[in-house]
Amino acid sequence: MVFTLASFLMPPLLVFGVYHLLTWFNTFAIDERTYWRRVALASGISHLLLVTGFLVFSYFDLQAHVRLQGTDTAFGPFLFNRSDFWRLMTIFDTAATFAILGLFSVLDRMGINPPGLVLVTFTVIYVMGTLQWYWLGGGIGALMEKFWAGLKTGDEEEEEEWF
């Protein structure tokens, strides 16, 4: 239960942290952009960080598995068959999952098994997943912008000194 809660809270908290780091240091000239684009950019960068972290830790998990089991397993079969890759992909990267499954089904129907499918999978995850989270984060940012604009009172008072 705690793992499930943490897995759903980690991406928004990471986006929140990345957003504030980007705005504090004005990276990518983010302060000149509209609010929804700032949130979208933070979401895309957060996706890149999360995917890279997952793939690196999956590789470390493979190394531990090889050391403990004494088997010679390649990274591709280990990633697709023995890790939480598909579960996390279907939850967080739906567009990339559909693209990967579509590509694999087309290749299977054609009877082709080209080399480098793991690299193609990583490319699809990075491109499609980042675009998905860019637009999803942008949509959430636009909704938040509308919400915050609705909270304003409408009468713009001059700023008074509080002391």
Residue ranges, per PLM feature:
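Membrane-helix boundary/juxtamembrane interface motif
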Residues: 2-157, 162
